[in-house]
Amino acid sequence: MKAADIRNLDSNQIHNKIAELKAELFNLRFQHAVGQLENTARLRTVKKTIAQMKTIISERGE
């Protein structure tokens, strides 16, 4: 998800999306530890998206 797309969302939607991504990140880390994760780049992408969303929220002053 691009930063411009994130900026178009309202704060509640961003917070909900962060919660979804954190759950996905938990599952990806578990799969990675077990050795079942095929797309390891997805870990980095999810973490980066969460960071972008948190940055946009802090820019808004919330």
UniProtKB/Swiss-Prot annotation:
GO BP term, example: translation
Pfam families: Ribosomal_L29 (PF00831)
Keywords: Ribonucleoprotein, Ribosomal protein
Superkingdom field: Bacteria
A Gene Ontology molecular function term of the record: structural constituent of ribosome
Disulfide links within the chain: none
Family annotation (InterPro entries): Ribosomal_protein_uL29, Ribosomal_uL29, Ribosomal_uL29_CS, Ribosomal_uL29_sf
SUPFAM superfamilies per UniProt: Ribosomal protein L29 (L29p)
A GO cellular-component term linked to this record: cytosolic large ribosomal subunit
CDD domains with a match to the protein in the record: Ribosomal_L29_HIP
Family per record: Belongs to the universal ribosomal protein uL29 family.
HAMAP family membership: Ribosomal_uL29 (MF_00374)
Listed name of the protein: Large ribosomal subunit protein uL29
Species the sequence originates in: Acholeplasma laidlawii (strain PG-8A)
